Amino acid sequence: MYYDNAFGYIPAHWVTILAVILFSIAFILHVACLAFTRKWLVIVPIIGTIGELAGWACRLDASYNPDDYNAFLGQIIALIIAPVFYSAQAYVLFHHIVLLYGPRFSVLSPKLYGGIFITFDIIALILQAAGGGVAGGADSGSQLQTQGSQIMLGGICFQLFTIVVFSILFSIFFIALYTHHPIRPSTGRREPDVPYTRVRTMSCNCLALATFAMVVRSVYRVIELAQGWEGAVITHEVWFDIFDFIPMIFTSALLIPSLYPALERSKLPFTEKHVSSMEYAPSEYGPSEYGPSINDITNMSAVIYPDSFLAPKDPKKSFSSEEL
C-alpha cells in the first residue's frame, strides 16, 4: 500500500526490529573477533556494521514516525555508505589469500588489490554520500533531488563495476589455483605452498558468498535508483528487505569466518617482503613447481626468525601441514 511520505510506505515494525537485533549481534561478534585477534583489519567490518545498525535504527524510528524526514535521510546515507566498508574488507582479505596460496595464480600483484579496489571504493563512497546528501536535502520532485539521485546512481554503478571486476579476478584466481595452472610466469623466487584444509576452503567459500551477496545488493540499488524516487522498486518495502537487508546481514556474518586466511598467514614464518624479495634454497627433495616444501619453510624460519618458536631446535624436525 502506498503511503504519502518520503518512503512511499511505512517500514514494517518486525522487519526493522529484526534487522536491529541481527546487526547488533553481528557487531558484538565483530568486536569479539577484534578483541581475540587484535588485528586492525577487523575494524573495517565493524564500521560497516555500525553503519548498517544506524540505518536500520532510523528505519525503526520511521516505523513509529513515518513522516519523520530526518529518519528517511539518515537511513539513506547510512545504508548507502555502510556496504563500502564490507567490500573494502573483501579486497583486503583477498590480498591475504593470494599471498597465502601463491601470487603466481593471480592476474594482479597482491598489493594492487587493496590499492586499486579500495581507491575505487572511496570514489564510489564519495559519490554516493554526496548524491545522497543532495537528494535527501532537496524538495521532493525538484531538479536538485533529481541531480542528487543521478550522482548517487553514478556512485552505485561505479561500485557495482568495481565489485564485478573484483569477482572476475577472484574467480580466475581460484580456477587457476585448483587446476594448478599459474597465470603469471615464475620469477625464480619460491612461494609458500600451503595445502588445502577444510577450514581454509570454508573460509574462502564464505568470502565468495559475501562477495556474491554484495553484487546482488549493488544490482538492486542500481535498478532502484534508475527508476527514481517514485519508482515501483523504491516504494515497495519487500524489495528492499529481500535485496538489501538479507544480502547485507549475510555479508556481515560471512566476513567473520573469512578472516581465517589473513590470521593464518600472520603465523607463517615469512612476510610479504620475504616472499617478494628472497631467494629460497630448494629442499633435499628438489625444487617444486608450485612452491617450497614444508622443509623449505622450516629452513626459512630458522634464518628469518632464529629466536622464535617457529625455528625448530632439532634441524631434522620439520613442521606438519597442520602446524602451518
Swiss-Prot record:
This protein's UniProt keywords: Membrane, Transmembrane, Transmembrane helix
Cellular component aspect of the GO annotation: cell division site; cell tip; cytoplasm; fungal-type vacuole; Golgi apparatus; plasma membrane
Listed transmembrane segments: 14-34, 40-60, 72-92, 115-135, 156-176, 206-223, 238-258
Main location: membrane
An example Gene Ontology biological process: phospholipid translocation
Subcellular location: Membrane
UniProt GO MF annotations: ATP hydrolysis activity; ATPase-coupled intramembrane lipid transporter activity
Superkingdom classification of source: Eukaryota
Topological relation to the membrane, as annotated: Multi-pass membrane protein
InterPro entries named in the record: RTA1 (IPR007568)
Record-linked PANTHER family: PROTEIN RTA1-RELATED (PTHR31465), SPHINGOID LONG-CHAIN BASE TRANSPORTER RSB1 (PTHR31465:SF9)
Name this polypeptide is given: Uncharacterized protein C17G6.02c
